[in-house]
């Protein structure tokens, strides 16, 4: 065994960056900021063996998208049902296939005040570029996130929110959003 502990893992500074040309393009596309911007990822790859545990149905979290924020879907593909629901939410923007690759996603993440996501590659991307990340985990999360604790040894600006065993996603997401609201209000 390596004898690795939390204290021996270097707490990394951002080690990836978004391309400046993409940052400029997305900044213009987003326009003037009037509220805190929150990127949102609720679903991972549906072919992942644990997707049923780590992804959440959009209609479960939609009622909790507070008007205090401008929400931005960082999802690439979404269902027709989700698209119809998104169209009804004024403070949520979905770019869809305009997000062509991870360099686009990185630029968008960097322009957010926070990124709220389930356990997907976007959580790692946002963490690696130094974003404020709120990671939502089910109670049987991947081992890299450890069994307890609210900090990540891999990303210094990541806050881990752990769903209790048997807890529904709706009250859990509501709790996460309220915690984000408190943080953002204190930053005003």
Residue ranges and their predicted role:
Residues 1-188:
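Catalytic machinery of carbohydrate-active enzymes
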């Amino acid at each position: 065994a390596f004898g690795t502990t939390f204290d021996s893992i270097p707490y990394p500074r951002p080690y990836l960056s978004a391309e400046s040309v993409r940052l400029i393009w997305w900044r213009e596309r987003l326009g003037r900021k009037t509220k805190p911007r929150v990127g949102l990822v609720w679903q991972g790859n549906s072919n992942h063996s644990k997707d049923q545990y780590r992804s959440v149905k959009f209609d479960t979290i939609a009622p909790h998208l507070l008007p205090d924020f401008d929400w931005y879907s960082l999802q690439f593909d979404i269902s027709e049902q989700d698209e119809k629901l998104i169209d009804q939410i004024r403070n949520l923007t979905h770019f869809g296939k305009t997000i062509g690759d991870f360099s686009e996603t990185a630029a968008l993440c960097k322009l957010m005040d926070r990124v709220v996501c389930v356990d997907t590659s976007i959580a790692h991307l946002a963490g690696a570029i130094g974003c404020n990340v709120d990671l939502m985990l089910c109670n049987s999360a991947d081992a890299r996130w450890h069994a307890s604790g609210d900090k990540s040894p891999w990303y210094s600006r990541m806050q881990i929110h752990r769903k209790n065993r048997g807890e529904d996603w709706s009250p859990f997401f509501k709790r996460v959003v309220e915690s984000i609201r408190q943080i953002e209000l204190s930053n005003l």
